[in-house]
Design a protein with these regions (language model features):
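Membrane-interface alpha helices of multi-pass inner-membrane proteins
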Residues: 18-35, 40-46
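Hydrophobic alpha-helical membrane-interfacial segments at the cytosolic entry of transmembrane helices
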Residues: 21-27, 54-78, 177-185, 242-246
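Membrane-interface helix-loop-helix junctions at transmembrane boundaries of multi-pass membrane enzymes
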Residues: 15, 52-61, 157-184
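Hydrophobic/aromatic-rich transmembrane helices and adjacent perimembrane loops
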Residues: 1, 203-225
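Membrane-interface transmembrane helices that cradle and orient dolichyl/undecaprenyl
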Residues: 1-18
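Transmembrane helical bundles and short interhelical boundary loops of multi-pass, membrane-embedded
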Residues: 47, 72, 84, 235-265
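Membrane-lumen/periplasm interface segments of specific transmembrane helices
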Residues: 35-163
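Juxtamembrane "helix-exit" motif on the non-cytosolic side of transmembrane helices
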Residues: 76-83, 160-166, 190-202, 253-265
């Protein structure tokens, strides 16, 4: 996805073959462990015609992307459809992939309500909560998640430097909307996968979804809130020094509390 952002920011350059291959390989390798992220590869379909050498070149590349996307989708769906029982995870309790899938197909509107409620209720924690920003795994969560969230949002809004390239470096409205649509579709697949494999049949609380599942695309959500009209007049060196100082201060404070105070004293 970083390769894709690079291409969006370099509108005057052509999308070179080496970067196309690198993008596809990275997406395929990244999706193999969890194929639910496959919709993210479709983000490159919104690249403008100016990024390609010809109209034919654009159609060929985007056709390859669609084929790869369907292949990743098949790797996700075929095991569930061919052997739903094998897709169940007993750690979720009395799960049954076949029965859960049947329930979704028979009660699609009921499932949409369940899905929407679970996503909305956990959205803030998934992007800005302790599990997303300052989790120390088995050691526990930090106490300054609100501060981390405010700091991260501030960086997203001020990371413009006020130079002549600011307007080129920020994403246009259509690109932001396309990114957000792709991310919403990805979120739907993440929750649906866990509903089928990790949640008991017809339960209204979907189990197993963790904040870390949002990490592959959370960075790009922050890119979508940047404002090209907001100028940062601080020099690059001073700005980066300020960011690193605040980041380390928060990190060391959390480590001191969680590791030294809670575990050593």
């Amino acid at each position: 996805m970083c390769i894709l952002v690079r291409e969006f920011n370099r509108k005057e350059e052509k999308y070179q073959n080496r970067w196309r291959i690198a993008f596809i390989l990275c997406m395929v390798l990244g999706c193999l462990p969890k194929a639910v992220y496959f919709p993210m590869i479709l983000s490159c379909l919104i690249l403008g015609k100016e990024k390609f050498y010809s109209k034919k070149d654009a159609w060929i590349f985007k056709g390859i992307i669609v084929v790869v996307c369907f292949a990743l989708l098949a790797s996700f769906l075929l095991p569930v459809l061919s052997s739903p029982e094998q897709s169940s995870d007993t750690r979720g309790g009395d799960t049954n992939g076949a029965s859960q899938l049947s329930y979704i197909l028979k009660q699609p509107f009921a499932y949409v309500v369940v899905l929407g409620k679970n996503v909305i209720d956990t959205l803030q924690d998934s992007f800005m909560g302790p599990k997303a920003l300052n989790s120390f795994a088995y050691l526990g969560d930090g106490k300054y998640s609100a501060l981390c969230a405010a700091f991260l949002t501030g960086v997203a809004l001020t990371d413009t430097y006020g130079d002549k390239q600011t307007k080129k470096k920020t994403l246009d409205i259509s690109t932001r909307i396309a990114f957000l649509i792709v991310f919403i579709v990805t979120i739907v697949f993440i929750w649906t996968a866990l509903y089928i494999s990790f949640t008991e049949v017809a339960e209204e609380i979907i189990q197993g979804v963790q904040a870390r599942y949002y990490l592959p695309f959370s960075f790009f959500v922050y890119l979508c809130i940047q404002n090209k009209n907001l100028k940062n007049t601080i020099s690059l060196e001073k700005y980066q020094l300020c960011i690193m100082t605040i980041s380390n201060a928060i990190l060391f404070r959390e480590i001191g509390q969680i590791v030294l105070v809670n575990k050593c004293l």
